[in-house]
């Protein structure tokens, strides 16, 4: 282990001299596997745990999810932390916080207790995701980003598949309990974060990141897409899974099996989507995603209007998740239009924008859910249509000065 404890700094351009498993992209893959082991266990068990153990209703689950999104709204605080801690270290510390909070979740089966553990795990999750996006865009070249990000998504899905598969098998055949599942998922995430701290050097990017809040007018379309995506994502994360339990009575192993199918599909298709993104570009990829999501959410609405059954609902859940995996197209769009030194501060700002609606929307929609669950999905369909309109404003070849179709036309006219 002595050779693993070397924390020397390695310049990014010199990292190719390291063994492949110790290079920056390899670290991104390990972290991509570590995060879902805790988060996926938490997600898979949450709806059943809060209904069966904590006796939650739609209002409480809405409040819990709103509290969970507060650290995302405050992700801009990452910029302040980066004044005294490098991004790589902050990412690993955040993974430890996420894993530790998930590990102790079942010891606090009350509304108040779950608010506390959820807040801690959420700080870890959102700060990790903020830093992770920045590191991905700094460490992966523009040319390789679409396919590499596709493989990173597949790695995360594979880790989730393992976690979900063990939950299904353990619940059905070995009497797995909430306590053991949470301890195992959170504990492995902590262990992998410690491994990453010991095994990898500190990587030094030749382009220093700005340590201040960055808001640029020319990034407005990226900000708008982030806002709409955050609002829409909450409805899928909170209410689609909650519907499976409340309306169709899915048990732990059934709902987890559905998540398992989701991640299996992602493992197979995320690399393909990365290649498609490289071929068809961000505009066409995002148009495809949002058009598909508009149809999916409309059909969710139809479940309540026309009384359609569980098979359709489960199928939509899988398709829904598949479309959401295309979100890395927004990352590569920003990578193409941004100044290299803006990656870290803009990742923090973007996460805050992404979570503006996420803080209050679940709680408000929780009350709407009591009155009309179908209306929640009708609202989501409207958000997907709005995102579709925004994606049509992306030029075919986005770049600095050509961030939108309007800017691209001005550039062509000036030429």
Predicted feature descriptions by range:
Residues 33, 101, 112-128, 310-325:
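Hydrophobic core of transmembrane alpha-helices in multi-pass small-molecule transporters
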Residues 96-109, 292-306, 392:
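C-terminal ends and interior cores of transmembrane alpha-helices
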Residues 167-168, 186-205, 390-395:
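C-terminal membrane-cytosol helix-exit motif in multi-pass small-molecule transporters
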Residues 284-327:
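C-terminal transmembrane helical hairpin of 12-TM major facilitator-type secondary transporters
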Residues 44-59, 238-255:
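Short amphipathic helix-loop junctions that connect adjacent transmembrane helices
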Residues 149-165, 352-361:
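Glycine-rich segments within core transmembrane alpha-helices of 12-TM secondary carriers
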Residues 127-140, 325-338:
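Intracellular juxtamembrane helix-capping segments at the cytosolic ends
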Residues 74-87, 171, 269-282, 369-370:
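Helix-to-loop junctions at the C-terminal end of transmembrane segments
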């Amino acid at each position: 282990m002595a050779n693993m404890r070397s924390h020397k700094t390695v310049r990014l351009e010199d990292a190719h001299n390291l063994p492949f498993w110790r290079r920056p992209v390899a670290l991104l893959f390990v972290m991509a596997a570590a995060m879902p082991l805790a988060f996926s266990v938490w997600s898979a068990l949450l709806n059943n745990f809060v209904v069966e153990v904590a006796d939650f209703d739609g209002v409480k689950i809405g409040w819990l999810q709103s509290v969970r999104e507060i650290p995302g709204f405050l992700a801009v605080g990452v910029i302040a932390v980066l004044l005294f801690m490098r991004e790589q270290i902050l990412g690993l510390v955040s993974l430890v916080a996420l894993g530790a909070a998930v590990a102790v979740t079942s010891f606090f089966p009350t509304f108040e207790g779950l608010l506390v553990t959820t807040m801690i795990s959420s700080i870890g999750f959102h700060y990790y995701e903020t830093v992770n996006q920045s590191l991905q865009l700094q460490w992966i070249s523009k040319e390789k980003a679409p396919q590499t990000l596709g493989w990173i998504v597949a790695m995360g899905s594979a880790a989730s598949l393992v976690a979900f598969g063990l939950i299904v098998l353990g619940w059905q055949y070995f009497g797995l309990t909430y306590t053991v599942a949470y301890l195992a998922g959170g504990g492995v995430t902590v262990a992998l974060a410690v491994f990453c701290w010991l095994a990898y050097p500190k990587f030094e990017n030749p382009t220093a990141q700005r340590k201040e809040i960055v808001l640029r007018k020319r990034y407005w379309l990226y900000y708008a897409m982030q806002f709409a995506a955050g609002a829409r994502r909450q409805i899928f994360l909170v209410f689609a899974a909650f519907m499976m339990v409340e309306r169709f009575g899915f048990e732990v192993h059934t709902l987890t099996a559905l998540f398992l199918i989701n991640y299996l599909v992602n493992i197979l298709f995320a690399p393909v989507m990365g290649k498609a993104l490289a071929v068809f570009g961000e505009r066409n990829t995002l148009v495809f995603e949002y058009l598909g999501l508009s149809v999916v959410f409309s059909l969710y609405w139809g479940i309540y209007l026309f009384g359609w059954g569980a098979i359709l609902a489960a199928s939509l859940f899988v398709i829904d998740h598949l479309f959401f995996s295309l979100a890395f197209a927004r990352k590569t769009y920003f990578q193409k239009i941004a100044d290299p030194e803006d990656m870290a501060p803009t990742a923090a700002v973007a996460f805050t924008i992404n979570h503006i609606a996420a803080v209050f929307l679940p709680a408000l929609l929780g009350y709407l859910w009591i009155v009309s669950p179908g209306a929640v999905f009708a609202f989501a369909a409207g958000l997907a249509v709005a995102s579709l309109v925004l994606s049509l404003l992306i030029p075919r070849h986005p770049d600095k000065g050509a961030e939108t179709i309007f800017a691209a036309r001005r550039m062509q006219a000036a030429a």
